[in-house]
From Swiss-Prot:
It is found in: Cytoplasm; Mitochondrion; Nucleus. It comes from the Eukaryota. (6S)-NADPHX binds at N61, N62, G63, G64, D65, G132, F133, S134, F135, K136, G137, P138, D161. Its EC number is 5.1.99.6. Keywords: Cytoplasm, Isomerase, Metal-binding, Mitochondrion, NAD, NADP, Nucleotide-binding, Nucleus, Potassium. Its cofactor is K(+). Residues 11-221 form the YjeF N-terminal domain. GO terms for molecular function: metal ion binding; NAD(P)HX epimerase activity; nucleotide binding. The lineage of its organism: Eukaryota, Fungi, Dikarya, Ascomycota, Taphrinomycotina. GO terms for biological process: nicotinamide nucleotide metabolic process. This is NAD(P)H-hydrate epimerase. Catalyzes the epimerization of the S- and R-forms of NAD(P)HX, a damaged form of NAD(P)H that is a result of enzymatic or heat-dependent hydration. This is a prerequisite for the S-specific NAD(P)H-hydrate dehydratase to allow the repair of both epimers of NAD(P)HX. May have a role in meiosis.
């Protein structure tokens, strides 16, 4: 069975469907997505070896998924630090940050290249939660320099939904300092995006919230999730466009 890919426009439409006919709130979807991310991290990078995790969050919903994941990772025994140089103003994001503050999880809300380089040296793993399916290049600073520093550091990276800087429907950058950005692990959310056809590493799918009604409406072919897991391993599984 091939697994369906969702283009950027189809992913946007499906999200809208989930929050209208599907009756989900953005809070619910973000919580479930972040929980999936945390489970993928735990599967691949156990806290006994990768306790120091640097979670790089962008200003949108993908960054919100990272904020949620940080809270769950703390509960699993990790020592997360959140790098959030362009924090979002909506109340939802403020509440997510307050939850992290209450757990004494460091949240860095401004960019300093030297400080970021030190955080990279102090970490075992980066969770790339910067850009999601709505990304369109070019990558602007501070995120361009952040991603370039991650590439240079050679640290292990898990990307959320799509590797940041990759064009959602076309794949990785073909030139420039970010052409070598290629995470070790990818967790697609809801369904893989077309760029994941170019991805050759460990690949998980998360977002166990798509109903049969929506699956049928969008003509999706998605794998079953085992047991109570919020992620399923789809490494090397064939992918096809809807």
């Amino acid at each position: 069975m091939s697994i369906s890919c969702l283009s950027a426009s189809a992913a946007k439409a499906l999200d809208a469907e989930l929050m209208s006919a599907g009756a989900f709130s953005i809070d619910q979807l973000m919580e479930l997505a972040g929980l999936s991310v945390s489970q993928a991290v735990y599967r691949e990078y156990p806290p006994s070896q990768y306790s120091q995790v640097l979670i790089c969050c962008g200003p949108g919903n993908n960054g919100g998924d990272g904020l949620v994941a940080a809270r769950h990772l703390w509960q699993y025994g990790y020592k997360p630090t959140v790098y959030y140089p362009k924090p979002s103003s909506p109340e939802l994001y403020k509440r997510l940050c307050k939850q992290l503050d209450d757990l004494d999880i460091p949240v860095v809300k401004s960019h300093d290249s030297n400080h970021f380089s030190q955080l990279l040296r102090d970490s075992k793993l980066v969770v790339d939660s910067i850009f999601g399916f709505s990304f369109k290049g070019p990558v602007r600073d501070p995120f361009g320099s952040i991603l370039a520093a991650i590439v240079e550091s050679k640290i292990k990276v898990l990307s959320v939904d799509a590797p940041s800087s990759w064009e959602i429907d076309e794949g990785p950058q073909k030139e420039g300092p970010l052409k070598d950005f290629d995470p070790d692990t990818l967790i697609s959310l809801t369904a893989p995006k077309p760029c994941s056809k170019f991805y050759k590493g460990k690949h998980y799918l998360g977002g166990r919230f798509v109903s049969k009604v929506i699956t049928k409406k969008f003509n999706l072919s998605l794998p079953p999730y085992p047991g109570i897991d919020q992620v399923v391993d789809i490494t090397n599984k064939p992918l096809s466009m809807v």
